[in-house]
Curated annotation (Swiss-Prot):
Name of the molecule in the record: DNA mismatch repair protein MutL
Keyword rRNA-binding included in the entry's annotation: no
NCBIfam families assigned to the protein according to its UniProt record, in alphabetical order: mutl
GO BP annotation list: mismatch repair
Function in brief: This protein is involved in the repair of mismatches in DNA. It is required for dam-dependent methyl-directed DNA mismatch repair. May act as a 'molecular matchmaker', a protein that promotes the formation of a stable complex between two or more DNA-binding proteins in an ATP-dependent manner without itself being part of a final effector complex.
Organism superkingdom: Bacteria
Keywords of this entry: DNA damage, DNA repair
Organism: Borrelia duttonii (strain Ly)
DNA damage keyword on record: yes
Single GO MF annotation: ATP binding
UniProt record similarity statement: Belongs to the DNA mismatch repair MutL/HexB family.
Signal peptide segment: none
GO cellular component: mismatch repair complex
């Protein structure tokens, strides 16, 4: 007796439907694709009970003729492709001819449609079988009404989430379609309540309309680029709106949302200079790619894609984002006046190493004034009290001579303190800013017009040092004794091997000796004594872009040398930090953290019911 049998036609259709339609949002996606492909410029969506009870979509597109309406719900019927070659140049969102047949087999489906100048016709299908076909009062376009989803798929229905969760999934699909088609009016109603309305607008405005709430209606940054076969637009949020997961990294290829790890990683890499580890950007990537260089016929829901002859794409995305932030940084730094600082850091690069014995250096011992003593590490018997009655009061003993550590030398590089009078005002005017004092030995309080700034002293000092380091001139320095090291991960080995030439651009010479074994031969002069940091970076390489090494290294140096929390600092040094903060318009430390928090007078008064 034969064990292999032909499956019943209805069973085959149910299996196929289960692949294409897994929940209400899948139906919404397919029906929106059809409405968009019809040329509609107005689409309305109605959802009830998460789409399980009902999904109704109306559009003003080209409509479906009487003859086509009779067969449109049958398996593998489509108007979008005719032959095999059409799969190589897909111009529409749908093309397989599976959507309506899959929907019809797992729900009650009613379609009403008309073409221009013709009568409307209506067809109802239940469990994949036509229930009736009749003439209907005229409408403009098409109306698709799906009810009782999975009523004949009890197993599938049991795995659906609560109505509220299914509604959120439908909303996500609706937003993805709306943001990729800004030339269409979209409306969404949930349980008879109007939820979303988007009118025709530019892509930039549509991104702002759909996703602006995520960044509290701040403006997205924008990048546009064009290459052979590819047009690229990138919209990204300010760094302080970063997230702890990747959910707000969205990629659209030819107006389809896709899941592509290499492109997602390239976006993360592009933000690696400004975001801390495990913080992810809010970013939306739109790619328009020649249809001969992309294949969507992979995933049942078209979530995956293959690219042909576009190896440059991931790296170009990273580079574009990096260049954007570099340009932004240069605009800020063009007013950077402290050229002497950069020259001194360049000439005395060896001083960037705490391992150096400064006793044997060319630096002399320093006479310590009261204000300088506040910058230095305080001996145990030195006590400094808070500002009291508009005066600084010192208690205990201050050493008269002190040999500065590397940390203090860095501070002297950034500000030359002078003798401070015994008495000074509690609130000291700095240009148009008023310095109010230090809070918790961690924050600088500054009044500016009708605003109060709480500035993180460590983050601010770190950013100032970092900008000086990153912009100082560097030369390549050959190691007297090259260092050999091994990487354990094969993926890391492949990455390093492919990027050896790229490292030379940042003055790092590393050569591969054998499989997973390398030799570090040269580094930038400013990185002397920090070979271990570079090697550790090599060993932990995953997919970061090459120039993140420079950024990460100097960010680490700056972090180590900046003043810390619980460091009490002088009035002059505080003034210096505040002036740099406002002059350079600094917002984030090299690791992406906010440097300050601001409260307006209005907000403060409102908090105590003064408004």
């Amino acid at each position: 007796m034969n064990k292999i049998k032909f499956l019943d036609k209805t069973l085959v259709q149910k299996i196929a439907a289960g692949e294409a339609i897994d929940r209400p949002c899948s139906i919404l996606r397919e029906l929106l694709d059809n409405a968009i492909d019809s040329g509609a410029d107005k689409i309305e969506v109605f959802i009830e009970e998460g789409g399980i009870r009902r999904i109704l979509i109306t559009d003003n597109g080209s409509g479906i003729s009487k003859e086509d309406l009779k067969i449109c719900y049958l398996p593998h019927t489509t108007s979008k492709i005719n032959e095999e070659k059409d799969l190589e140049r897909i111009q529409t969102l749908g093309f397989r001819g599976e959507a309506l047949s899959s929907i019809a087999i797992c729900s009650n489906l009613m379609i009403t449609s008309s073409t221009t100048g013709e009568n409307s016709y209506q067809i109802e299908i239940e469990n994949g079988i036509e229930k009736y076909f009749k003439k209907q009062s005229a409408i403009n376009g098409t109306m698709v009404d799906v009810t009782n989803l999975f009523h004949n798929f009890p197993a599938r229905k049991r795995f659906l989430k609560k109505d509220s969760i299914e509604t959120k999934m439908c909303l996500k699909v609706f937003e993805e379609k709306a943001v990729t088609h800004p030339g269409i009016d979209f409306k969404l109603s949930v349980n008879k309540e109007l939820k979303k309305v988007y009118f025709k607008e530019s892509l930039a405005d549509r991104v702002q309309s759909v996703y602006g709430e995520i960044i509290e209606n701040n403006k997205f940054g924008k990048i546009e680029a064009e290459y052979d076969h590819v047009k690229m637009k990138i919209f990204f949020a300010p760094p302080n709106f970063s997230r702890k997961d990747r959910r707000n990294i969205k990629i659209f290829v030819n107006r389809r949302p896709i899941e592509e790890k290499s492109l997602s990683e390239s976006i993360i890499n592009g933000h690696s200079r400004i975001l801390t580890y495990k913080n992810f950007p809010v970013c939306y990537l739109f790619l328009e790619i020649d249809t001969t260089h992309v294949d969507f016929n992979i995933h049942p829901q078209k979530k995956e894609v293959r690219f042909f002859n576009l190896p440059f794409l991931p790296k170009q995305i990273s580079n574009n984002i990096n260049e954007f932030f570099d340009r932004e940084k240069q605009e800020i730094l063009q007013d950077y006046h402290n050229v002497i600082i950069k020259r001194q850091l360049t000439n005395d690069a060896h001083l960037l190493h705490p391992e150096n014995d400064l006793t044997n250096s060319n630096f002399k011992t320093y006479e310590i004034t009261q204000d300088e003593a506040l910058i230095l590490d305080k001996p145990k018997n030195n006590k400094v009290t808070n500002i009291i009655e508009d005066k600084v009061k010192f208690e205990g003993q201050i050493p008269q001579k002190y040999k500065p550590s590397f940390k203090q030398h860095i501070q002297k590089i950034f500000i030359k303190t002078s003798k401070m009078p015994n008495n000074f005002q509690k609130s000291t005017q700095t240009n148009e800013f008023k310095y109010m004092g230090q809070l918790f030995s961690e924050f600088l309080i500054v009044e500016n017009a009708n605003e109060i700034y709480f500035i993180d002293q460590h983050a601010l000092h770190e950013k100032i040092i970092y900008q000086t380091l990153i912009n100082s001139e560097k030369t390549i320095q050959k190691l007297l004794v090259p260092i050999e090291f091994q990487v354990e991960c094969e993926d890391t080995d492949k990455i390093l091997t492919s990027e050896l030439e790229e490292y030379k651009k940042i003055d790092i010479i590393v050569k591969k000796i054998q499989n997973q074994t390398y030799r570090l031969e040269s580094i930038p002069n400013i990185c002397n004594k920090y070979e271990n940091i570079i090697i550790q970076f090599f060993k932990t390489r995953k997919s970061k872009i090459i120039d993140s090494l420079e950024t990460e290294l100097y960010a680490t140096l700056a972090c180590r040398q900046a003043i810390k929390c619980n460091d009490t600092i002088s009035l002059e040094f505080s003034q210096f930090l505040i002036n740099e903060f406002f002059n350079l318009k600094l917002k984030h430390c090299p690791h992406g953290r906010k440097i300050y928090h601001k409260i307006t007078k209005f907000e403060l008064e409102k908090s105590v019911n003064r408004q």
